[in-house]
A protein has these predicted regions:
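Generic structural motif
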Residues: 26, 70, 106, 157, ...
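Catalytic lobes of large eukaryotic enzymes
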Residues: 148, 173-313, 345, 349, ...
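Short, solvent-exposed helix-helix connector turns and helix-capping sites enriched
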Residues: 32-37, 129, 177, 331-332
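Soluble catalytic domains of membrane acyltransferases
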Residues: 59-232
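Charge-dense, low-complexity intrinsically disordered segments
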Residues: 42, 46, 130, 182, ...
Length: 378
């Protein structure tokens, strides 16, 4: 009972603070985005999204990230991250300020949390090639056009691992003569292929992440078990994190690949990477760590969590309550004066170079031509 109360309190805490985040997002969307879309994106990522991560972390148990391999260091360069998808909480250990995550379209309709992810410009897909192709192209063109250093996370497996999905994955792989796996699901290529085609102009680096949790033994849950495990109880879920239960550390292995290496034959590339994941996870089961080569780095990172971030969030909202009305009360009178001026100017001077009177005059001219045309027909 106490655990349920604690979980409910944590969820309420996250929702309340997320609602405040929504307000801050709305303020930026209203005041900054119309003036400078690129600045809006950078503020939303480096300030608001990073703050949301910090605030949410106050509810979850502390965890260290033991990162082996090639750790991304150039934060100004676009990156595409591919990863295995063990459970519904693994994205939490990847999420940072400028990261965009590819998610199911239905999630954007979740109240408060979904609204926030939508304003953070996560990439929502319907799993419809016709819709997703055009949507991804427009989405990536917009990020590239603003020179935004996005880190886009995609889980090519498309869903979390369960025994029923493993059986379907293996049957599908056998039909296509592709490798069959036990620890991971066969990766899908269509969504990632569209994304790679859309970012061909910038050729981002590709980072392959493999995640594993302490005491992981390879247990795969059934649909009935959901995200819980009977043996690998240290594998977290969002439910367990809300209850304050989570692993003390998470193992992440990162390996960097060039854009050209991935695009030459994406299916073969993903099959090779997932075969490596299978072997890497088997090694982890035996040794409780990932293998490290001599030229690879080992870094221990701590997830940010500070009650001061909550103070910053609420202070920012309080200031916004005072500043937003002032800005709006200043904006609308000035806008009204400008519209009246443009109207008067357009009436007495038809040679103006101002854009608003020009459009107004153009509208009057076309209306006059239409009226004259109708009169001549009569």
């Amino acid at each position: 009972m106490m655990l349920q109360v604690y979980s409910a309190a944590n969820l309420l805490w996250i929702l309340c603070n997320s609602a405040v985040i929504n307000f801050c997002q709305f303020v930026l969307w209203l005041l900054v985005r119309p003036l400078d879309g690129a600045l809006y994106r950078r503020l939303m990522g480096s300030l608001v999204q990073a703050l949301w991560v910090d605030v949410a972390a106050t509810c979850f148990p502390d965890a260290k990230l033991v990162v082996t391999g090639e750790v991304p260091k150039d934060t100004a360069r676009p990156v595409i991250i591919i990863a295995n998808h063990q459970v519904d909480a693994d994205w939490w250990y990847i999420w940072q300020g400028n990261i965009k995550i590819v998610l199911k379209d239905q999630l954007k309709y979740v109240p408060i949390i979904g609204w926030g992810m939508r304003l953070f410009e996560f990439l929502f897909l319907r799993r419809s090639i016709d819709h997703d192709s055009a949507h991804i192209k427009a989405y990536m063109d917009s990020l590239i056009g603003d020179d935004y250093p996005f880190w886009l996370v995609i889980f090519p497996e498309g869903t979390t691992i369960h025994q029923e999905y493993v059986a379907k994955s293996q049957a599908f792989a056998e039909k296509l003569n592709r490798p069959k796996f036990e620890r991971v699901l066969l990766p899908r290529t269509s969504g990632l292929q569209i994304i790679l085609d859309a970012v061909a102009d910038v050729k981002p680096d590709i980072y392959d992440l493999t995640l594993a949790f302490p005491t992981y033994s390879g247990e795969v849950p059934t649909f009935e078990m959901g995200y819980s495990r009977k043996i690998d109880t240290s594998v977290p879920s969002m439910k367990s994190l809300l209850a304050g239960q989570g692993p003390p550390h998470v193992a992440i292995h990162a390996k960097k690949y060039s854009y050209d290496a991935a695009t030459q034959n994406l299916e073969q590339f993903l099959d090779a990477r997932w075969q490596e994941k299978e072997e890497r996870l088997n090694y982890f089961i035996a040794h409780q760590k990932f293998p490290v080569q001599k030229d690879e780095d080992v870094s221990v990172l701590t997830l940010p969590s500070s009650i001061f971030s909550v103070f910053k969030l609420w202070f920012g909202m309080t200031m916004s309550f005072f500043l937003l009305p002032v800005v709006m009360m200043s904006f609308f009178p000035l806008y009204t004066v400008w519209v009246v001026y443009c109207f008067v100017y357009s009436v007495y001077d038809r040679t103006t170079n101002f854009w608003w009177p020009y459009i107004f005059n153009l509208f009057l001219e076309r209306a006059g031509k239409t009226r004259d045309g109708l009169a001549s027909k009569k």
